[in-house]
A protein has these predicted regions:
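C-terminal substrate-binding subdomain of Rossmann-fold SDR/epimerase-dehydratase oxidoreductases
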Residues: 175-177, 181-285
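Conserved catalytic-core motifs of eukaryotic protein kinase domains, centered on the activation segment
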Residues: 60-68, 104-108, 157-158
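NAD(P)H-binding glycine-rich loop region in Rossmannoid oxidoreductase-like domains
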Residues: 41-72
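Active-site helix of classical SDR
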Residues: 124-127
Length: 285
């Protein structure tokens, strides 16, 4: 770090951890806030304001590396908090979390309701939220927690059947390949374009109260199977869409239906500009 950097940086500048990931890279490129992209091996924030995107992204790691979710979502996060606190007496930490923390519960999910996460990913994300709240109370720091819906959009390099399954299936439809949908795709999700995520994050960072939790999604329940079938029809795809039983492990770690109550963020003036549709999915080509 340049010795004069801390003296010259704008007090509003945000240090972005996870700046090369799907959402983090979009935030660095398109946020209206001044930002500094932290390198992968850096754990000490260059500024008093932090936004933290680093994390695992699905519930399947337990089958191959049972410690990964703990190491990434908890240990590394705490290392960043502690290293940054030694440099800055005041910190404002924004943790980007996930709707997965809600787990089994009434929908639409509200920020105030009890969380009951199911899989290792979900549990460690919720634990990170609680650790952040406790850490900030212990050391007199400030936080925000943002629970995202299912994010879609261009630039996601880690698409798979486990993570961002919607775009994984869209790609197969584009190639006229068959797709398998659990229970015919009769599941509900809350999809939000990454462009709207960046806009929502900016609003929260600049207009919201500190020490609060915000849902960031469309607030619209979307039937995934219906959406995919409409897309296949409108694009004249030759894909066969098959229905299959949901694997037991999937039912253990995920809920069937989920979407977010977005009243709180809408009170800041947030509106969706790119709702999910066949057209916004075509734009991913």
């Amino acid at each position: 770090m340049h010795p004069n950097y801390l003296l010259s940086v704008d007090k509003h500048t945000i240090s972005v951890f996870g700046s090369t990931g799907f959402i983090g890279s979009h935030f660095v490129s398109f946020s209206k806030n001044p930002v500094v992209a932290m390198k992968r091996d850096e754990i000490q924030s260059l500024t008093k304001r932090i936004i933290y995107f680093i994390g695992t992204n699905h519930n399947y790691n337990v089958l191959e590396n049972y410690l990964l979710d703990v190491q990434v979502n908890l240990v590394h996060f705490l290392e960043v908090l502690n290293a940054s606190r030694t440099l800055h007496k005041e910190l404002e930490i924004t943790l980007v979390s996930s709707w997965f923390v809600y787990g089994d519960g009434e929908i639409p999910y509200k920020e105030s309701q009890h969380c009951n996460p199911k899989g290792f990913y979900s549990i460690t994300k919720y634990t990170a939220e609680m650790l952040l709240q406790s850490y900030c109370k212990t050391f007199g720091l400030n936080y925000r927690i943002i629970r995202l819906g299912n994010v879609f959009g261009p630039g996601d390099k880690s698409i798979s059947s486990k993570k961002n399954a919607l775009q994984f299936l869209i790609r197969r439809i584009q190639r006229n390949e068959s797709i398998d949908l659990y229970e015919g795709g009769d599941i509900i999700r809350d999809f939000i374009h990454v462009t709207d995520v960046v806009h929502g994050l900016d609003l929260i960072l600049n207009k919201s109260e500190l020490n609060q939790i915000y849902n960031l999604g469309s607030g619209v329940p979307t039937n995934m199977g219906k959406l995919l079938k409409e897309y296949a029809k409108e694009t004249n795809s030759g894909s066969l869409i098959n229905s299959k039983a949901t694997p037991e492990f999937h039912t253990v770690v995920q809920v069937k239906n989920a979407y977010l109550d977005t009243e709180k963020i809408r009170s800041l003036g947030f509106e969706i500009s790119l709702p999910i549709s066949s057209q916004t999915l075509k734009d991913l080509l």
